[in-house]
């Protein structure tokens, strides 16, 4: 009984213990979901996640400060310790109104979080799980805020007040966003009413608040806006010119006026080369440690992003100078000041006169008022305006148009990224969250070269891009948003560059000074401090990697395919002590032979590849697997087999008999097929040298109806399988089949009218399938559906002819036809500027296409079309293919005729790639500036062209007569570099081409507006040094591409600044104001 009782008690105890453990686990789970558990914020994949909302796409931002880390989701702020433990210290529950982003998110203290979303702003405090939030009233009756677009908040610590800058859509005028600056008492409950506010003038639009901070008794905001250029209004009493400016705004922290009259704004920039006022600020960060402001802005004149750095000491000095200068002029002297500044009415003279570029927002009128002393009485300090004896003549709210020049840190060519949303400094490097043109969001790490050019180092995708997508922790980790939550990354050589390939993509130049250790069994990324412990340290080169290695079946040598082989000089192979002499070397493989008396046995399992990298010899071991052996015959060493007594005669006889048997079988099959299917016609296209045709040329039509009898049902089946959004009802089309207008790779083209609804009708083009190439025909349509760009032909849809069941591709109608025919036509008056516009349009379209990882493979003037406004659109995608994302190459699977006169010589060995289109683009520009001549017209075929191009890099198409030397050398010859890696990308070309135009405008603008004659074929065969060769008379080849900033003049224009009589209406390059920045190129103090 005792024993039984004991056992019973043990069971009860075990049951109770299990229940207790279950309750403990349940309590832990409940605490975890409530955000109270002191657990880590790190999952098994090294991803920081939001515990309070399991769907991690709800993570909208992350910030750090006061030794805390705050993760913001749609409905909660989760607060953690900013250390390795990441323990939860509290959370704030927000109201449940829908929000998609935070426009401001800032820690004011260890217990205060300020936020703004699209509709409201508030201040929250927390203590563990207890929290409260206030709502900041943004307006009374006026203005009526429809949506907040940007915001920045600053807490004035010693006063317990908050200043808030917001830009917003006004319900009454939503197309012109406005700005307000408001001041509040810091309050974390209820509704907080502003104690003062300032609304910007109505002529200032598209405002955006970038950042804000407090410094030495003043509050600063960095903002950007579009506004009327007030100096011109002042001179001429009217102006329609608007400028886009970036400005720093200062308020006195102790300003007690109801409308914040201490406000002063100064314009800032650092565009020494292009000194026009036309810069849109995108993101800014104040570096407290170094007392600097870093601003990323987009310059509309240079078409580049710029990173500018400003010393706060210089900014503050400018503010003091502006205020003191305005206080020097009394009210009685204002008329004389106006006369002195306004006459003569010449801007260049006015800008050098003291105080003539600072205006007061005395009221909300668009007429600018020169600043004079505030309040009409004695001169006041900027922070004492509330003591003014009179409420009249309150000349505050100053704005100075003398642009303060900062230090140019970096030029970032467009479109390296679209818009910079946020910026983090990391020593000599930077992290930025950026958005692209095609809904692509990335985090970048980059630094500046000595010449202020960007050096990209590292890049990764993020799920949501915004002001708070990235942050840096105390442990020198980068946190960024992903679809999983928050990804953590060590900011170190090993964290950023885990393998040599990532180093090669930009890590070599990282200021972290990373390199690759290629030691046996210890290959890794190392820092400069670890170099001494590495025997095989590599910098700027990666060790080769063996993809496979095959041994000859007579054991006399190897063939090896090696990645990264070009880095190795004087390569050698050694197999188990046996030297294998390298006999054949190409771009990615080597072959080697052993001595006749040496044989590599089957027991050998390792091969060493050695050679020079830089000035040091390296040796890399590779395992030789049994499965790789005996797969190749060494023809060179057949004599070795003779010495060993083998007789190859019978092998040769068998080979001959086998080949003859195969030929006989193929002949029988061909004979059978030709008699079995007599109606199937094989269409052979003419050689490429004879087929210089455009997409709208009429082609061969015979045999079509017979082909339909075989494939009609297949067409219907394939059409039904197409995506619904691509299908067009044939009943909505009226096709003019009596007048075909041309032929593409897979179809015949007709004009048509498309009526998707009763009230809408538009001209379109219908391309009908020819000769049964159904898969390639629909592939062209699928490819076109991937594109949406103003310089690429738009796909309307795909239809099926009701009567013939022929598939149809429907595209937009291009009124001016193909580019080749247009430039060939001598009746068309074409100016040199038009040719530049055509080239620029094509470059933009190709830049977009390459960003989508497609290559065109048939880029030529005949495949570019012109709309009624002479905008070029790239067409004919019959050869367009998706490239491999890693190699950026496309492997040709089927032989067919190709436009080889537009192709680079390397395609015969390496296949098609991104750089193939770059070469073709150079030929397209040559076509443009010869007005449609045929490339290599004196050579009959590719057999002659290919060896001529390979023989020397000087063997290239000659510079067309009348073509500017700078265009030929900087663009055409650059596109025709023998090494594909040295060719510019289209992302470079969209900047280079406008710069060539600016260069030309510097010495002969009239030439751009002159008619450009068609080049006679006789001149194309002449040497450039031949006396009969026509020349561009005003060529100045020794003039630098961009003038020095000290010699810059008001004559600098952009490509888009076309005279009214120009036939082109392209607005691809934005207009810029003719007004220059008013200070010198270096950073100025006043």
Curated annotation (Swiss-Prot):
Residue ranges, compositional bias (Polar residues): 1061-1086
Major location (coarse): membrane
Regions of this protein lying in the Extracellular compartment: 35-651
Gene ablation phenotype (knockout): Viable. Reduced axon regeneration 24 hours following injury of D-type motor neurons.
Localization per record: Cell membrane
Required for shc-1 interaction, annotated site positions: 767
Tissue-level expression: Expressed in body wall and vulva muscles, pharynx, intestine, excretory canals, distal tip cells and some neurons. Expressed in D-type motor neurons upon axon injury.
Effect ascribed to mutating residue 890 to F: Abolishes phosphorylation. Impaired axon regeneration following injury
Catalytic site: 858 (proton acceptor)
PROSITE patterns: PROTEIN_KINASE_ATP, PROTEIN_KINASE_DOM, PROTEIN_KINASE_TYR
The record's account of how the chain is modified after translation: May be autophosphorylated on Tyr-890 following dimerization.
UniProt: ATP binding residues: 741-749, 767
Keywords of this entry: ATP-binding, Cell membrane, Glycoprotein, Kinase, Membrane, Nucleotide-binding, Phosphoprotein, Receptor, Signal, Transferase, Transmembrane, Transmembrane helix, Tyrosine-protein kinase
In-chain residues carrying the UniProt-annotated modification Phosphotyrosine: 890
InterPro entries documented for this protein: Kinase-like_dom_sf, Prot_kinase_dom, Protein_kinase_ATP_BS, RTK, Semap_dom_sf, Ser-Thr/Tyr_kinase_cat_dom, Tyr_kinase_AS, Tyr_kinase_cat_dom
Renumbered residue ranges of the record's region Disordered: 1056-1086
EC id: 2.7.10.1
Gene3D superfamilies: Transferase(Phosphotransferase) domain 1, YVTN repeat-like/Quinoprotein amine dehydrogenase
Subunit comment: Interacts (via cytoplasmic domain) with mlk-1. Interacts with shc-1 (via SH2 domain). May interact (when tyrosine-phosphorylated) with tns-1 (via SH2 domain).
Protein name: Tyrosine-protein kinase receptor svh-2
The species this protein was found in: Caenorhabditis elegans
Name of the coding gene: svh-2
